């Protein structure tokens, strides 16, 4: 009898009992960031979601303001220039392999230059003054072009530390006198200024033993500069107020055999002088100056 009851129980209730489903384990999550911006946004979002509930209460007002304030503080710190940074100048100008191009950007002063700058092009701006401090720490310069500015003053010694400087252009400015020039200069251009003879010292060019090209046209010179170096090849003095030349201007009156072998070109047109009256002044030259003879 008991055996029949047990069999009946198994037949009636076993089909109703089902095995428990297998436990599903969460698969690991993988985050793939397509780019840096997306990654940054995800990280910020995670930080926001991990804030305490009382901080996120009232939604965007508290947390967003805080986030923006913190972001602004970080931006201010990162943008604040340090003493040695070159970023401001190279954002304003173009810096490329030792060359700095600051042309036609209306700057009014020489910008701080990156160290190791060799070539500076700052043409057609509004620079009025060159100070000693502008190049105090930049001794690697080889070429400077300040053409087309408004330069009226150059402090004494502004170029004194530029011992490697070979080319300097101050053309189309408002200079009335010349600064002391660095010793290795090969090319100097001061065309179209307001320079008078008293604005050039007697020995301004004497020690420039590498100077080959000297451009002083369209100024207010009354005479040819003295003590021109033997290295000179091209001399432009056109359109000044030169009225006289003596026998020692280009030659040596006490040495009739002296010849200026390197001088190839002298331009003196546009001056109130008849060159034919001073033929002895050109006896050492291989070619006569360009200008009015009769």
Curated annotation (Swiss-Prot):
Transmembrane segments: none annotated. GO terms for molecular function: growth factor activity. One of its GO terms (biological process) is bone development. Gene3D superfamilies: Ribonuclease Inhibitor. It is found in: Secreted, Extracellular space, Extracellular matrix. LRR repeats lie at residues 108-127, 128-151, 152-175, 176-195, 196-221, 222-242, 243-273. The composition of the N-linked chains or the substitution of the N-linked sites is different between embryonic and adult tissues. Contains keratan sulfate. Glycans are attached at residues 61, 241, 254. SUPFAM superfamilies: L domain-like. Coiled coil: none annotated. Pfam families: LRR_1, LRR_8. Its main location: secreted. One of its GO terms (cellular component) is extracellular matrix. Residues 1-19 form the signal peptide. Keywords: Disulfide bond, Extracellular matrix, Glycoprotein, Growth factor, Leucine-rich repeat, Proteoglycan, Repeat, Secreted, Signal. Disulfide bonds join 251-284. Induces bone formation in conjunction with TGF-beta-1 or TGF-beta-2. Belongs to the small leucine-rich proteoglycan (SLRP) family. SLRP class III subfamily. This is Mimecan. It comes from Gallus gallus. The gene is OGN.
């Amino acid at each position: 009898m008991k055996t029949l009851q047990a069999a009946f129980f198994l037949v009636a209730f076993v089909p109703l009992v089902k095995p428990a489903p297998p436990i599903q384990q969460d698969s690991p999550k993988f985050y793939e960031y397509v780019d840096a911006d997306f990654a940054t946004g995800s990280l910020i979002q995670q930080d926001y979601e991990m804030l305490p509930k009382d901080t996120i209460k009232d939604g965007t007002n508290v947390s967003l303001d805080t986030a923006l304030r913190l972001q602004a503080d970080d931006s201010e710190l990162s943008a604040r220039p340090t003493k040695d940074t070159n970023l401001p100048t190279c954002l304003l100008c173009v810096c490329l392999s030792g060359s700095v191009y600051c042309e036609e950007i209306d700057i009014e002063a020489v910008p701080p230059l990156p160290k190791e700058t060799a070539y500076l092009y700052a043409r057609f701006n509004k620079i009025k003054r060159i100070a000693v401090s502008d190049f105090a720490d930049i001794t690697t310069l080889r070429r400077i072009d300040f053409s087309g500015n408004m330069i009226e003053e150059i402090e004494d010694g502004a170029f004194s530390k530029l011992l490697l400087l070979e080319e300097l252009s101050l053309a189309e400015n408002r200079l009335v006198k010349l600064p002391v020039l660095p010793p290795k200069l090969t090319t100097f251009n001061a065309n179209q200024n307001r320079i008078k003879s008293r604005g050039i010292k007697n020995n301004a060019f004497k020690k420039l033993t590498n100077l080959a090209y000297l451009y002083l046209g369209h100024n207010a010179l009354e005479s040819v500069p003295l003590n021109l170096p033997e290295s000179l090849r091209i001399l432009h003095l056109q359109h000044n107020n030169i009225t006289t030349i003596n026998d020692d201007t280009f030659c040596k009156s006490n040495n009739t055999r002296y010849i200026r072998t390197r001088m190839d070109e002298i331009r003196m047109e546009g001056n109130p002088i008849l060159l034919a009256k001073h033929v002895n002044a050109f006896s050492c030259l291989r070619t006569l100056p360009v200008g009015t003879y009769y």
